[in-house]
A protein has these predicted regions:
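N-terminal export and membrane-targeting signals
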Residues: 1-10
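C-terminal motif of bacterial Sec signal peptides marking the signal peptidase cleavage site
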Residues: 15-18
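Acidic, Gly/Ser/Thr-rich repeat motifs that build Ca2+-stabilized beta-propeller blades
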Residues: 20-189, 240-247, 288-319, 335-337, ...
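Blade-edge beta-strand/turn elements of extracellular beta-propeller
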Residues: 45-57, 89-103, 142-162, 198-229, ...
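Short, solvent-exposed loop/turn segments at secondary-structure boundaries
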Residues: 191-194
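Repeat-solenoid scaffold signature
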Residues: 222-249
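Short, solvent-exposed mixed-charge patches
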Residues: 397-399
Length: 399
């Protein structure tokens, strides 16, 4: 059994039908620091930091992560297609299992998104969106959990190429109300440059699956192209869209996304200086990053979850005119102006303390939430995988 109880008060937990290895995630006392055997056994840097709290443990390849305004979170598992609701201080509860998911390599149940979480405030399940791999493709689904019965699933967008690797998979509703979808090249680099393919793109669609009417090509869902495998995206207070992208063997990237922009893959990896392509604003050697999730923190910096790099990278953003942090908020997602922001020197946080980091999001109170990803690749600790909460006051000065 893979469940590991680390809460100060033991809670009775029933085994969930269909859980991998009869495993059930368990809650931890979020008021405690990140003590235990996991981080210290694996750490090659400073010891566990008390600014990080372990909130839940025992997840199996967690991927999707959505914070809700009531303080709870949704966590999806890639292999089992199970979605849990996590209330800090309690054991995660199984919300639903998404049917029709066919895990394959890096594919499975990937990103989750909620258009308006006000429907969750009464404690009842509400619809959410999911990016999932099936037997034939990757697709975006609208899932209504129901009351314990089979969930109602509606296909929003299908036909996204799938493969064992490079499936993209992050989805998020932007400040403009449209759904943004990241796709990988599905191990076919040429498809990233094909405007008629959904592979290797960032897509922008309505909640019903239609192309956003003011896309670069109004009849196409494509917002940007030339991507290898984007797995993170978020907006700053001015509505600028930032995305993290896996490189191949040389350089990983953070890009400032411009509508209609071509980011160069497979012709370019990292900065290329080619006039027809947009260079990344940040790049790292692949062994230092392999970036998955990305979030704009309450301090205005980008936070990038690194898998191979086993770190959380902090990238400062400064408004070029005022010299102040960009911060978080709302804006017009397609109104990007690359010259209005200055990107600072990346800072590596929590190196080696928690292993591979898959997802990072900013919560309603400015806290950061991080999912580890050690149960697929890596060196899992006994309580992996974990949901961690970072103290906002420590974001700018972590070890």
């Amino acid at each position: 059994m893979r469940g590991h109880l680390v809460a100060t008060v033991a809670l009775g937990v029933a085994l969930l039908a269909g859980c991998s290895e009869d495993r059930v995630p368990t809650g931890a006392d979020p008021s405690n620091g990140s003590t235990g055997t996991g981080p210290s056994d694996r750490s090659t840097g400073p010891g566990p930091d008390e600014s990080v709290a372990t909130v839940a443990t025992g997840f199996e390849v967690p991927w999707g992560l959505v914070p809700l305004d009531d303080g709870s979170l949704l966590v999806g598992e890639r292999e089992t297609a199970q979605v849990f609701r996590v209330v800090p201080g309690s054991d995660p509860s199984l919300l639903t299992t998404v049917p029709g998911v066919a895990p394959d390599g890096e594919g499975g149940l990937l990103g989750l998104a909620v258009p308006d979480d006000s429907a969750w405030h009464d404690g009842e399940p509400a619809p959410f969106f999911a990016y999932a791999t099936t037997d034939t493709d990757n697709r975006v689904l609208r899932v209504e959990p129901g009351d314990g019965s089979e969930p109602a699933v509606e296909v929003v967008l299908d036909g996204i190429p799938k493969a064992g690797n490079h499936n993209g998979g992050r989805i998020a509703f932007g400040p403009d109300g449209y759904l943004y979808v990241t796709t990988g090249d599905a191990s076919d680099g040429a498809s990233a440059q094909d405007p008629d393919s959904l592979a290797g793109k960032i897509l922008r669609i309505t909640a019903e699956g239609a192309p956003a009417p003011d896309n670069p090509d109004p009849g196409s869902p494509v917002l940007s192209l030339g991507h290898r495998n984007v797995q993170g995206l978020d907006w700053d207070s001015s509505g600028r869209l930032w995305a993290s992208e896996f490189g191949q063997n040389a350089l990983d990237e953070v890009n400032l996304i411009q509508p209609g922009g071509n980011y160069g893959w497979p012709q370019v990896e990292g900065p290329g200086g080619e006039p027809e392509f947009i260079d990344p604003v940040v790049s790292w050697p692949t062994q230092d990053a392999s970036p998955s999730g990305l979030a704009v923190g309450a301090d205005g910096a980008l936070y990038v979850a690194a898998l191979r790099g086993e770190s959380l990278w902090r990238v400062p953003l400064t408004d070029a005119d005022t010299g102040t942090d960009a911060g978080t908020g709302t804006g017009t997602a397609t109104g990007t102006d690359p010259g209005s922001v200055t990107v600072g020197e990346p800072e590596r946080l929590y190196e080696g303390e928690f292993g591979r980091q898959r997802s990072v999001v900013t919560g309603p109170d400015g806290e950061l939430w991080v999912l580890t990803s050690n149960t697929f690749r890596g060196d899992p600790a006994p309580d992996d995988d974990r949901l961690l909460r970072l103290d906002p006051a420590a974001q700018a000065g972590s070890p």
